[in-house]
């Protein structure tokens, strides 16, 4: 049953990640909606709504302007799922969401470096007039990277639990977290 629940959460996370990138803007990236869907599918709608509302408030307080903001949504989803699956209280979901958000931000920052290379690959394909390849890179490679950067951390953290998230977050050097914070802050002032 744990594996089935984990796979459900992974599918929700894929929908959440591809929402604004492929499906338009259906607001699947909002913790209130994501956690509510998680609660509904995992059999505890009340906890899903409560965690979603708490995380939505936290997200509104940390909303950034620009492309380098934090991904509180993945942390919210993981926290909600672990809370429902373990029967823990709502405060536990928030406690799990913070390190998961940090891990998610670091993973996305690294993925951004790879996505920049995709842009160069598209430019090179267009210069060679290989438009099919340029289209394939844009439509397949980018979303595939988003999905990979989502399913691996979500699956591992939900399946193995909060202890894994906490232990990984505690090993991250301070210079990495400081760099991520600096990058997010620079985007706020448009540098």
Predicted regions and their residues:
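Generic secondary-structure signature for well-ordered alpha-helical cores
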Residues: 16-20, 47, 83, 87, ...
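Conserved small/polar residues in nucleotide/adenosyl-binding loops
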Residues: 189-191
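Hydrophobic transmembrane alpha-helices
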Residues: 1-74
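Helix-loop-helix junctions within the multi-pass membrane cores of secondary transporters/permeases
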Residues: 94-179
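Alpha-helical transmembrane segments of multi-pass membrane proteins
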Residues: 178-187
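Hydrophobic, small-residue-rich transmembrane alpha-helices and their short perimembrane loops
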Residues: 53, 57-121
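Alpha-helical transmembrane segments in multi-pass membrane proteins
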Residues: 8-12, 31, 35, 39, ...
């Amino acid at each position: 049953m744990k594996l089935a629940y984990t796979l459900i959460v992974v599918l929700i996370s894929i929908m959440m990640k591809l929402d604004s990138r492929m499906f338009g803007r259906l607001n699947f990236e909002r913790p209130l909606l994501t956690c509510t869907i998680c609660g509904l599918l995992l059999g505890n709608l009340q906890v899903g709504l409560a965690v979603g509302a708490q995380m939505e408030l936290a997200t509104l307080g940390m909303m950034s302007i620009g492309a380098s903001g934090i991904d509180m949504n993945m942390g919210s989803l993981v926290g909600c799922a672990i809370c429902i699956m373990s029967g823990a209280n709502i405060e536990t979901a928030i406690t799990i969401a913070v390190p998961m958000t940090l891990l998610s931000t670091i993973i996305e920052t690294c993925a951004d470096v790879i996505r920049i290379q995709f842009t160069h690959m598209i430019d090179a394909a267009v210069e060679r007039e290989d438009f099919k390849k340029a289209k394939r890179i844009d439509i397949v490679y980018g979303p595939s990277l988003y999905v990979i950067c989502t399913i691996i951390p979500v699956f591992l953290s939900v399946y193995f639990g909060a202890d894994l998230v906490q232990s990984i977050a505690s090993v991250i050097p301070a210079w990495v977290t400081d760099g991520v914070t600096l990058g997010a802050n620079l985007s706020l002032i448009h540098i």
